[in-house]
A protein has these predicted regions:
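Membrane-proximal juxtamembrane linkers immediately C-terminal to transmembrane helices
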Residues: 31-35
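Exposed acidic/Ser/Thr-rich ligand/metal-binding surfaces
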Residues: 23-26, 37-38, 43-46, 54-61, ...
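Positively charged n-region of N-terminal signal peptides that target proteins for export
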Residues: 1-5
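Bacterial N-terminal signal peptides
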Residues: 7-17
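A short acidic, often aromatic-flanked loop/helix-cap motif at beta-alpha or helix-coil junctions
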Residues: 199-204
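An active-site-proximal "capping" alpha-helix that borders the catalytic cofactor pocket
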Residues: 55-76
Length: 216
């Protein structure tokens, strides 16, 4: 009887050891912790994107595809101050966000990047999940050329800092991305700027962005 009992105990120990070995990260690798995020994708729909709109829509969708189960996202399109629209409120549904992205369209107007960021930041504060561990941020897709925002950058930055909202920018342009405003928005809010030299670099940048925004 003792031999049988000893054999059972040995089998249990071996089983637990095997289970631990299977779940243990491989040597030389680490498992990165991630935090849940509440964020808005804020997309420039001004005339300078007329020939690039399809690509911009795909970039927005690719960002959404990186979402984790606990992430919640809203989508804003903008041109001028009076043409800032919430296309999709907070949702965890990738399908809803994809459908909203397909509704984007280019139109004329004096681009108001700062006003769009302020609009989106205030929506984020008002509607986001209030979990303490949840990171709040905005992802801005733009060429960086602000033509006529009513707000000054100092006003926008104060609201971002007061509410611990980080801004990340994917700078896209057929010519040259204007970095004066987006440099301040990203650096002073604790975010980061990504400017691909060619569109072929965008997929890798989206992967890097996804990791960056979710790493504590």
């Amino acid at each position: 009887m003792k031999k049988v009992f000893s054999s059972i105990v040995l089998l249990l120990v071996l089983s637990l050891a095997n289970s631990f070995a299977q779940n243990k990260p491989a040597a030389g690798t680490t498992q990165k912790a991630t935090v849940p995020i509440s964020y808005g994708i804020v997309v420039d729909n001004s005339g300078s994107f007329r020939s690039m709109l399809d690509r911009i829509i795909e970039i927005a969708k690719d960002i959404v595809e990186e979402n984790k189960a606990d992430d919640e996202t809203f989508l804003v399109r903008f041109v001028s101050t009076d043409k800032i629209s919430l296309l999709q409120d907070f949702t965890v549904s990738k399908d809803e966000l994809h459908r909203a992205a397909d509704e984007m369209y280019v139109e004329g107007g004096l681009t108001a990047i700062l006003d769009a960021v302020d609009f989106s930041a205030r929506h984020l504060v008002e509607k986001a999940n209030s979990e303490a561990s949840r990171r709040k941020l905005l992802i801005l897709l733009t060429d960086g050329d602000d033509r006529q925002s009513k707000l000054k950058i100092e006003e926008v930055l104060k609201f971002l800092k007061d509410n611990q909202i980080r801004v990340y920018v994917v700078g896209i342009s057929e010519e040259k991305v204007s970095t004066k405003i987006i440099d301040r928005l990203t650096k002073e809010s604790g975010g980061k700027k990504f400017v691909p030299k060619t569109l072929s670099e965008v997929p890798a940048i989206i992967k890097e962005l996804s990791t960056t925004i979710r790493t504590p």
